[in-house]
Amino acid sequence: MSGDKPHGRLVILAGPSAVGKSTVVDRLRSDVPNLYFSVSMTTRDPRPGEVDGRDYFYVTAQEFQEKIDRGEMLEWADIHGGLQRSGTPAEPVRQAREEGRPVLVEVDLVGARNIARLIPEAETIFLAPPSWEVLVERLTGRGTESQDVINRRLETAREELAAQSEFKHVIINDDVDTAVSAIKAVLLGT
């Protein structure tokens, strides 16, 4: 990194499944110039419309473990009761920050805790639903998961909601425009 360019601001975004993280992130990607959005790696199957390398890097469990073993992951976790593994590749985040770009990392609760411990100057944002009932409605309305998967995601959501006080910022996603504006202000330090 050159001496006259500060590190880019690192913002960690977490929240329960179906809270609207993907919608908010899509808007931020188009609204924030020079934003580096960290693409997570996952062992889960793509949902309809998701693209490898844009939404996630989709890998097998074996490939994921090999990347961990080589030290190529900033953080990783087994999530939803062991249904899948997800994590953040380290090198692209480091490089974008050295270039002075704002960096947005979308992770689960465990990932947020791990990155915040490694990079304490990171800003942490918890994206919360307006209510538990709205979250349940959004999750079941997707129609992409079995009831067993929905139940596991709801169990995980209860744990995540209980931990929201650990985050520097809690933003309620009852209006996408308002949520995007609030996150944008944190990303840009305004």
Curated annotation (Swiss-Prot):
CDD domains: GMPK (cd00071). Its main location: cytoplasm. It catalyses: GMP + ATP = GDP + ADP. GO terms for cellular component: cytosol. ATP binds at G15, P16, S17, A18, V19, G20, K21, S22. Keywords: ATP-binding, Cytoplasm, Kinase, Nucleotide-binding, Transferase. GO terms for molecular function: ATP binding; guanylate kinase activity. The keyword Nucleotide-binding applies. It is found in: Cytoplasm. Its EC number is 2.7.4.8. Essential for recycling GMP and indirectly, cGMP. Belongs to the guanylate kinase family. NCBIfam families: guanyl_kin. PANTHER family: GUANYLATE KINASE, GUANYLATE KINASE-RELATED. This is Guanylate kinase. It comes from Corynebacterium efficiens (strain DSM 44549 / YS-314 / AJ 12310 / JCM 11189 / NBRC 100395). The lineage of its organism: Bacteria, Bacillati, Actinomycetota, Actinomycetes, Mycobacteriales. The gene is gmk.
